[in-house]
């Protein structure tokens, strides 16, 4: 039995609130159960130096957590003077995932930065950031199209992510912190709405996982992510 009482294939309650902040071109509050992340999309003219003259745009991401997003206070990374390895790994994952959603050639000389700020963490912060970050980015792109600043829609497909794992010998989807901290296997899956995989990050924590367990986890991820695509579409159409 999962600590939350959920079935193995049951996600937490998912909620995406659009236009959550005032100033950003796109913004959402995304909630995976008790995990809550604010995702904002900022549009700027120009691209990084390494892309100048390439006639394309750029999408990147930054990730951070409030000091009391967790059970005990974490020192702000700004106060330490540098970002931690976990933070860098997660924001690179978010950036890679969201770049895979767009044709950068269709947004020349435009950069979009997705800022993902975790205000409450209960497992799955990176997957929530990717899922909410896509909606914030898509909303910003829709604004550019409406203003005539983009001629063609660069979005190729939706992108969303979810965690899966093996908990007490059973493959489960969308792990909360209690499950994640005790799971025998922990995996994050990023997919497109065309059933393409963007990233699969899986680690055996206690014991190796079998090919049957891997298949079961990927099936659970696909089912869960399809639910996320429905939630994304509903909020984008609202």
Swiss-Prot record:
Entry binding sites for phosphate: 86, 124-126
Keyword field contains Nucleotidyltransferase: yes
GO molecular function: 3'-5'-RNA exonuclease activity; tRNA binding; tRNA nucleotidyltransferase activity
EC primary class: transferase
EC number: 2.7.7.56
Segments traversing the membrane: none
Catalytic activity, as annotated: tRNA(n+1) + phosphate = tRNA(n) + a ribonucleoside 5'-diphosphate
UniProt keywords, alphabetically: Nucleotidyltransferase, RNA-binding, rRNA processing, Transferase, tRNA processing, tRNA-binding
GO BP terms: rRNA catabolic process; rRNA processing; tRNA processing
Subunit structure: Homohexameric ring arranged as a trimer of dimers.
Protein family: Belongs to the RNase PH family.
Role played: Phosphorolytic 3'-5' exoribonuclease that plays an important role in tRNA 3'-end maturation. Removes nucleotide residues following the 3'-CCA terminus of tRNAs; can also add nucleotides to the ends of RNA molecules by using nucleoside diphosphates as substrates, but this may not be physiologically important. Probably plays a role in initiation of 16S rRNA degradation (leading to ribosome degradation) during starvation.
Name of the featured protein: Ribonuclease PH
């Amino acid at each position: 039995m999962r600590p939350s009482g959920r079935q193995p294939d049951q996600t937490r309650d998912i909620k995406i609130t659009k236009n959550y902040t005032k100033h950003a071109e796109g913004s959402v509050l995304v909630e995976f159960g008790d995990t809550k992340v604010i995702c904002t999309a900022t549009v700027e003219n120009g691209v990084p130096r390494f892309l100048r003259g390439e006639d394309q745009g750029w999408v990147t991401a930054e990730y951070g957590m409030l000091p009391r997003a967790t059970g005990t206070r974490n020192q702000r990374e700004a106060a330490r003077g540098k970002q931690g390895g976990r933070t860098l790994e997660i924001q690179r994952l978010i950036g890679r995932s969201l770049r895979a959603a767009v044709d950068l050639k269709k947004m020349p000389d435009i950069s979009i930065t997705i800022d993902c700020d975790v205000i409450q963490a209960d497992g799955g912060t990176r997957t929530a950031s990717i899922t909410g970050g896509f909606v914030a980015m898509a909303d910003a792109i829709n604004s550019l199209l409406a203003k005539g600043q983009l001629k063609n829609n660069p979005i190729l497909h939706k992108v969303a992510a979810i965690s899966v794992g093996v908990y007490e010998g059973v493959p489960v989807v969308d792990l909360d912190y209690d499950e994640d901290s005790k799971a025998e296997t922990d995996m994050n899956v990023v997919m497109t709405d065309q059933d393409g995989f963007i990233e699969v990050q899986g680690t055996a924590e206690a014991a190796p996982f079998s090919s049957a367990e891997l298949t079961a986890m990927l099936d659970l991820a696909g089912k869960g992510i399809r639910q996320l695509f429905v939630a994304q579409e509903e909020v984008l159409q609202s």
